[in-house]
Swiss-Prot record:
Its cofactor is Zn(2+). Belongs to the class-II aminoacyl-tRNA synthetase family. GO terms for molecular function: alanine-tRNA ligase activity; aminoacyl-tRNA deacylase activity; ATP binding; tRNA binding; zinc ion binding. Consists of three domains; the N-terminal catalytic domain, the editing domain and the C-terminal C-Ala domain. The editing domain removes incorrectly charged amino acids, while the C-Ala domain, along with tRNA(Ala), serves as a bridge to cooperatively bring together the editing and aminoacylation centers thus stimulating deacylation of misacylated tRNAs. This is Alanine--tRNA ligase. The gene is alaS. It comes from Chromobacterium violaceum (strain ATCC 12472 / DSM 30191 / JCM 1249 / CCUG 213 / NBRC 12614 / NCIMB 9131 / NCTC 9757 / MK).
Length: 877
């Protein structure tokens, strides 16, 4: 039975038992900031189990995509070396939210596993465990199901504390908990291992395939269990494990869903297909994890989920390198994955090109340093060393992009120790340098426990209000005097407090028409809950708590912010239209001058794409759609398809902003009435802000017109300088200047090469003879990297058995190349030689045993460094 058939049978079975088939949630947990990834089927239902959320069903079933590769849920180092460990896997589950309990959960499981129309597993091949005191579950298995007593094992508190058991589940030290019953498949006596609960239970003979958790109690801080009024059921069954049973194989990687990826890995790395090559299994597992992560909006980066993706991808790439594949290969396996799993998970098909592009870009990035880094490992382990030192591990991490677990993998394969404690010391030293270099101060937080501020700013620019509180800095005061800087809290306001990327409003707060008091508001922020703090300076008069005031915004500034905020929504929708559905917002800043929008995308936006974005947005502006804001329930907003930001906290009621049928987003900001009010939209900048994150800056309305006029003036000024009359003439004259510059640069490079070459010819006579080896360390003034390499090759040919270092200074930097002839690489390594010099001039480098390059930033130390080369070489011979 194919894996896809097993998945379908499971969902069909529980649908026939009244369960709602719920699609898999994202690998990014939407409701649990404590988890980096979705690690189990119950994650998307956590708030339902805790009573914080209600759904219109009480029974559910899912096939949930899961990832375990970060934090305490981390199987990464075992993947590829065991039959069952994975980073990505699918978990089948059925759930009861205060509906059925133990009897139905157990009989459902038994019927699905053994029923002739379902999986029809042999009953004598199954055995179960129950919690030691769970007599109810034991009796259901023994009396209702009819399982013999010798097939039921009671498991007690086997982890050193009350209720610390393989068969007792807890959500934490307190809260929902309960016993569980696990179902095992017996592979037979030909496989090593004993039954659960026995001393040799860790063998492979008895394999757990299904776990039924019974959320029956609430544990208080004293450790006492109290029965829950509505007990629930949470079950999980690994699809890959179940497939091994039904396909009569011993390893998950032999199942149809994974074997096809192992074959694809063999094809792309150029090796023969075999289940005995761990590297092929690593690649097969990791292509699933990486592809699903990218499909769910994660891109490789140096932090958080993006770094986990980078670690997994680079581990796979390194295993390809280990098999001899030095070219790009990993992204080519995405198509095989889509063919296998695209029907069950349509997001793979929809985002295939994006996934391939993201993984290909990561391959290219790592390829730049992989070979050099591996050479550094080889050099560090010369002389039969049994450990890789922490400083080298840190250098691999910091300079060459080797995740620490990847380096640990390499050490494990070679049977040597990885000095991870030394690595941590090097990391801490870097953190200390970072802390010493930083110079920031935390701003104080205001303590406020009064009433909230009512916001009237969607339809009013001025409101009458009462002063609820006043502050100087973070200290509460009864009054402010002329010249005082402070914060004013009102019971009502037209001022928008900074949020959702939009800056706070500015304006004034006045008493008695500004005669009694006039407070200039420079910013508005939420200081506690929904209480708004109006920050500014009292220009005249006095202001006291309890005063009646008028709060009036700067309408011109507000309208400019509104234009830019509405344009941001249009840009977001246009980005998804032009670049693809993978685009998600990563941050924004909206102020009266411009809008700045950060979004997930793996490469620079091209000039043609920017032009298309501008065309699309301005087309919607010209259409003059009405901008509608509507309050609705969160559930209704989700069903409407409105865009919402991952990680943003929303209440039960949300504000949905729509612009025709082009854009719909959850937003609490201020906006124009119609899209035509934006006037004009112009992108002024595009660039990268982090790995996989791009930023676009744009202006609107009068700001866009001013930008275009400034660009026009610049072009006219350039034309005058070039003595050109038309734009065509400007381009022609620029092209002519470029051609002339290229010709001069080419001639200059040729002359430099000739000078360096002639200098190199004369240098051969300066080589010292040390034990029959020619040793030369010299500076070539004016040489570039190409000239250094060409001269090095000539000298190696001319000198025979030789070790050579050549250097050049320029722009406050040092360029270095080192070469060792082939007959000496067993004793001398070019990488070690070049680093000996580079470290003395403030640099580092690497390369092959016969040729290496480096750079430095301390040219004043070059002469001394070169003078030490002869002694260094003599010490190695």
């Amino acid at each position: 039975m194919k894996t896809s058939e097993i998945r379908k049978k499971f969902l069909d079975f529980f649908a026939s038992k009244g369960h709602q088939v719920v699609p898999s949630s994202s690998l990014i947990p939407g409701n649990d900031p404590t988890l980096m990834f979705t690690v189990a089927g119950m994650v998307q239902f956590k708030d339902v189990f805790l009573g914080f959320e209600k759904r219109d069903y009480t029974r559910a079933t899912t096939s949930q995509k899961c990832l375990r590769a970060g934090g305490k849920h981390n199987d990464l180092e075992n993947v590829g070396y065991t039959a069952r460990h994975h980073t990505f896997f699918e978990m089948l589950g059925n759930f009861s939210f205060g509906d059925y309990f133990k009897r139905d959960a157990i009989t459902f499981a038994w019927e699905f596993l053994t029923g002739e129309q379902w999986l029809a597993l042999p009953k004598d091949k199954l055995m179960v465990t129950v919690y030691a005191t769970d007599d109810e579950a034991y009796d259901i298995w023994h009396q209702t199901v009819g399982l013999p007593a010798d097939k039921i094992v009671r498991i007690g508190d086997n982890k050193g504390a009350p209720y610390a058991s393989d068969n007792f589940w807890t959500m934490g030290d307190t809260g929902p908990c309960g016993p569980c019953t696990e179902i095992f498949f017996d592979h037979g006596p030909s496989v090593a291992g004993g039954p659960p609960g026995s001393p040799d239970e860790d063998g492979d003979r008895f394999m757990e395939i299904w776990n039924n958790v019974f959320m029956q109690f609430n544990r208080d801080e004293a450790g006492t269990l109290h029965p829950l009024p509505k007990p629930s059921v949470d079950t999980g069954m690994g699809l890959e494990r179940l497939s091994t049973v039904l396909q009569h194989v011993k390893s998950n990687y032999e199942t149809d869903a994974l074997a096809c990826l192992v074959r694809a890995a063999a094809r792309e790395t150029g090796v023969e297909y075999s289940q005995d090559v761990p590297s092929l299994k690593v690649i097969a597992d990791h292509i699933r994890a990486c592809s699903f992560m990218v499909a769910d909006g994660i891109l490789p980066s140096n932090e958080g989920r993006g770094y986990v993706l980078r670690r997994i991808a680079r581990r796979a790439i390194r295993h390809g390198y280990k098999l001899g594949q030095k070219g790009l290969f990993f992204h080519k396996i995405v198509a095989d994955l889509v063919a296998e799993m695209g029907e069950a998970y349509p997001e793979l098909r929809e985002k295939q090109a994006h996934i391939e592009d993201a993984l290909r870009a990561e391959e290219i990035k790592f390829a730049e340093t992989l070979e050099i880094g591996m050479g550094l490992v080889d050099s560090a382990l010369e002389g039969g060393k049994t450990a890789l030192d922490g400083d080298t591990i840190f250098k691999l991490y910091d300079t060459f992009g080797f995740p620490v677990d990847l380096t640990a993998d390499i050490c494990r394969e070679r049977g040597i120790h990885a000095d991870l404690e030394g690595f941590e010391r090097a990391m801490e030293a870097q953190r200390e340098r970072g802390r010493a270099g930083s110079n920031f101060k935390m701003s104080g937080k205001i303590a406020y426990d009064g009433e909230d501020t009512r916001f009237h700013g969607y339809d009013k620019s001025s409101v009458e209000a009462k002063v609820l509180a006043l502050y100087k800095g973070t200290d509460p005061v009864d009054s402010l005097s002329a010249g005082d800087e402070g914060i004013v809290v009102l019971d009502g306001t037209a001022f928008y407090a900074e949020g959702g990327g939009q800056v706070g409003d500015v304006g004034e707060i006045s008493a008695a028409g500004g005669i009694a008091a006039l407070f200039d508001v420079a910013d508005t922020q939420k200081i506690q809950g929904a209480a708004f703090g109006h920050k500014g300076k009292l220009a005249r008069g006095a202001l006291k708590v309890g005063d009646a005031v008028t709060a009036t915004i700067d309408l011109h500034q507000r309208q400019a912010s509104a234009r830019n905020h509405s344009a941001t929504h249009l840009l977001h929708a246009a980005l998804r239209h032009v670049l693809g559905g993978h685009v998600v917002q990563k941050g924004s800043l909206v102020n009266p001058e411009r809008t700045r929008f950060d979004f997930a995308h793996g490469e620079a936006v091209t000039a043609a794409q920017i032009a298309e974005l501008e065309r699309v947005v301005n087309h919607v502006i010209a259409a003059n759609y009405e901008v509608k804001a509507e309050l609705m329930s969160m559930e209704a907003a989700q069903k409407s398809g409105a865009m919402m930001l991952f990680g943003e906290k929303y209440g039960d009621e949300v504000r949905v902003l729509t612009m025709g049928d082009f854009s719909a987003e959850l937003c609490g900001g201020t906006h124009v009435k119609r899209t035509g009010d934006i006037g004009l939209f112009k992108i002024v900048a595009e660039g990268g802000v982090a790995a996989g994150v791009r930023r676009i800056e744009a202006v609107t309305g009068e700001g866009a017109l001013a930008y275009i006029q400034a660009q026009d003036a610049l072009i006219k000024e350039a034309a005058a300088a070039l003595k050109a009359q038309t734009s065509d003439e400007v381009l022609a004259k620029i092209a002519a200047l470029q051609d002339s510059a290229k010709a001069l640069e080419k001639e200059l490079a040729k002359l430099k090469g000739q000078l360096a070459s002639s200098a190199g010819d004369s240098l051969a006579d300066a080589a010292a003879d040390i034990n029959g080896v020619k040793v030369l360390a010299a500076e070539l003034p004016g040489a570039d990297n190409t000239a250094l390499r060409e001269t090095l090759d000539k000298l190696k040919d001319k000198l025979g058995s030789a070790a050579i270092v050549l250097a050049a200074k320029g722009d406050g930097k040092v360029a270095l190349v080192a070469g060792v002839t082939a007959d000496l690489t067993g004793k001398l390594k070019a990488g070690e030689l070049v680093n000996f010099v580079a470290q003395q001039v403030g640099g580092k480098g690497g390369g092959r045993p016969d040729m290496a390059q480096a750079g430095g930033t301390q040219p004043e130390n070059l002469d001394a460094a070169l003078n030490g080369v002869q002694a260094w070489v003599a010490g190695k011979l």
